[in-house]
Design a protein with these regions (language model features):
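Conserved N-terminal phosphate-binding loop of PLP-dependent enzymes in the Aspartate aminotransferase
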Residues: 23-476
Length: 476
C-alpha cells in the first residue's frame, strides 16, 4: 500500500530536532515501530513495554493469514479479535462499501431520517435473531452497544413505575466493553481498578467448571452455579435488580463454557423475579457456535441482545442492540425521546457491508459448516492436546476453544504468576506462525468460520509445538 501523505517526524534517524517532512513508503520496520511508539497509544497494552520492544507492524492479510513488515506469514487463529468471520480479502465487502460510498457515504439518523441499507439490515437481523427481538438500535462497538442497553433497561423500568430497579448483575471474568458503564457490567478487576467501579453493578462467579466444579456432576454444577445468581438477587433485593447480563460463552474471560442446564436455571430465576435477561452475543454471534446466535444453540430467549464483531466481520465498525418486544413496546408507547445515540449510529456504509457479510455467511453455508463439520473437527483435533504435560483442560464450543495451561495435572496446580506462562506460550505460537491469544494461562482460539480442516490441522500442529517449547523452557 502506498502512503502519499508526508509527516513531520523528529523521532526517526536522519531527522533533525525541528523535524523533517518524510514520505512513509520506504520506512523500515524499526522506523515504523519508532513512529508508532512516538504517537500511537494502543488499547490494552503496557505502554512502557510496548515502546521498549516495538509493535508488530501488520501490513496486509488474505484468506486466513496476516503478514507483518518482516515478511512473516501468520495463520490467524483469532479472526482478528474474534471478528473476521468470513476471512480476509473478501472483495464482496470492499465492493459493497465502495458502492455505498458513491451513493450515500454518510447521513445521520437523528432528524427523523433513515437510509435503505440500515432499514434492510434491521429487517434481516429481526429475521435471524431469536423470536421476540424485532427492534434494533445501532452503535459502533460492543462497548457502545452494552452501554446503550444499560441505559435502555433503566429507562424501561422507570417507565414501568420501578425506577429503583437499576442494579445490573454480571459475572466475574465477564467482558462487556471498556466504557465506564460497560466495564462496570463486566467482571474484569483490572478495569475496575483503573476506572472507579460505578454503583448499582454486582458480580457473581461464572460457571467456570475448571475452577469451581470439583466433584459435582454436570447437572449439580449447573444448578449450583445458577444458585449464585439467586443468592445475589436475594442479597440485593429483587425489587432493585434490573437485569442479568451474560455472554453465552465468556470469550475474553477465557472461553468459559457453561454446563448444560445452567442457562435454563438462570432464565427461570430471572422470570421468577421479573428481571430482564441480556445476552451479550458480541463474540458468539453470526455463526460461531453453529447457529446464527449462541442463544439459539443453547435455547435461550433473551429479553435483549447485543452484537458487533461478526456483524461486519470487522471490516468496518458496527454494533447493534436487539430490543425485545416487551421493552420496545413500552419505550415506543411511553418513552418519549430517548436521549442517546451516536454520530455514526446506523452508518449507511457499515450497514451495506453488514448486509454483504450476512449474504456471504448465508450463501457459503458457514453456519451449517461450523455446526456439522469444522466445529466438531476442531474439538476432535484439539482433544489429544489434553494429554500434554502442560495442559489441564481443552474446551471447545463451535469455533471457540481454550487450552488451559497448568503447572501440574495433579489438583490441577495452577501457575503462581498468572499470565506469565500464557504469554510465553503465545509468543512461541506466533513465532511458529500461529496467532493465538493468552487469557491468564489459557490459550484461546477463535478462527474465521471459513477455516478448513487443513487450517485446523496446521493450527494444532503449531499449538502443540508451542506447548512443547513452553514446557521445555519451564523445565517441566
Amino acid at each position: 500500500m502506498s502512503f502519499g501523505i508526508k509527516v513531520k517526524c523528529r523521532f526517526l534517524a536522519g531527522c533533525n530536532e525541528h523535524g523533517a517532512d518524510m514520505t512513509l513508503d520506504e520506512l523500515s520496520t524499526r522506523e515504523w515501530q519508532a513512529l508508532d511508539s512516538a504517537h500511537h497509544m494502543a488499547p490494552f497494552c503496557d505502554y512502557g513495554e510496548l515502546r521498549q520492544h516495538g509493535a508488530r507492524i501488520i501490513t496486509h492479510a488474505e484468506g486466513h493469514y496476516i503478514h507483518d513488515s518482516e515478511g512473516n506469514r501468520i495463520l490467524d487463529g483469532m479472526a482478528g479479535l474474534w471478528c473476521v468471520n468470513v476471512g480476509y480479502g473478501r472483495t464482496e465487502l470492499v465492493e459493497a462499501a465502495s458502492r455505498q460510498m458513491t451513493t450515500l457515504p454518510y447521513y445521520n439518523n437523528f432528524f427523523k431520517t433513515s437510509n435503505r441499507p440500515v432499514t434492510a439490515l434491521s429487517a434481516k437481523l429481526a429475521e435471524l435473531t431469536p423470536d421476540g427481538l424485532n427492534n434494533v438500535f445501532y452503535a459502533n462497538s460492543g462497548s457502545e452497544a452494552n452501554d446503550t442497553i444499560i441505559r435502555m433497561v433503566r429507562h424501561f423500568w422507570a417507565l414501568e413505575g420501578h425506577p429503583e430497579k437499576r442494579v445490573i448483575i454480571g459475572r466475574d471474568y465477564g467482558y462487556h466493553g471498556s466504557t465506564i458503564m460497560s466495564a462496570s457490567a463486566g467482571g474484569m478487576s483490572g478495569m475496575h481498578e483503573q476506572a472507579a467501579h460505578e454503583a448499582d453493578f454486582e458480580h457473581i462467579r461464572p460457571p467456570y467448571g475448571f475452577l469451581y466444579q470439583g466433584n459435582q456432576d454436570e447437572a449439580q454444577f449447573a444448578a449450583n452455579a445458577a444458585s449464585w445468581l439467586a443468592d445475589r438477587i436475594a442479597e440485593v433485593g429483587a425489587d432493585r435488580v434490573a437485569a442479568f447480563i451474560a455472554e453465552p460463552v465468556q470469550g475474553a474471560g477465557g472461553v468459559i463454557i457453561p454446563p448444560r442446564g445452567y442457562f435454563e436455571h438462570v432464565q427461570e430465576i430471572c422470570r421468577r423475579h421479573d428481571i430482564l435477561f441480556i445476552a451479550d452475543e458480541v463474540i458468539t454471534g453470526f455463526g460461531r457456535t453453529g447457529q446464527w446466535f449462541a442463544s439459539q444453540t443453547m435455547d435461550l430467549q433473551p429479553d435483549m441482545m447485543t452484537m458487533a464483531k461478526g456483524l461486519t466481520s470487522g471490516y468496518v465498525p458496527m454494533s447493534a442492540v436487539m430490543v425485545g418486544d416487551r421493552v420496545a413496546t413500552r419505550l415506543i408507547a411511553d418513552g418519549g425521546e430517548f436521549y442517546h445515540g451516536f454520530t455514526y449510529s446506523g452508518h449507511p456504509v457499515a450497514a451495506a457491508v453488514a448486509l454483504a457479510n450476512l449474504e456471504i455467511i448465508e450463501g457459503e453455508g458457514l453456519v451449517e459448516r461450523v455446526r456439522q463439520d469444522t466445529g466438531p473437527y476442531l474439538a476432535e483435533a484439539l482433544a489429544p492436546l489434553a494429554e500434554h504435560r502442560l495442559v489441564g483442560e481443552v474446551r471447545t464450543y463451535g469455533m471457540l476453544a481454550a487450552i488451559e495451561l497448568v503447572k501440574s495435572k495433579d489438583g490441577p496446580e495452577l501457575f503462581a504468576d498468572t499470565g506469565t506462562v500464557g504469554a510465553i506460550c503465545r509468543d512461541h505460537a506466533i513465532a511458529g506462525g500461529l496467532m493465538m491469544r493468552a487469557v491468564r494461562d489459557a490459550m484461546i482460539l477463535s478462527p474465521p468460520l471459513t477455516f478448513t480442516r487443513d487450517d485446523i490441522d496446521e493450527t494444532v500442529r503449531i499449538a502443540r509445538r508451542a506447548l512443547d517449547l513452553t514446557a521445555d523452557q519451564l523445565g517441566l
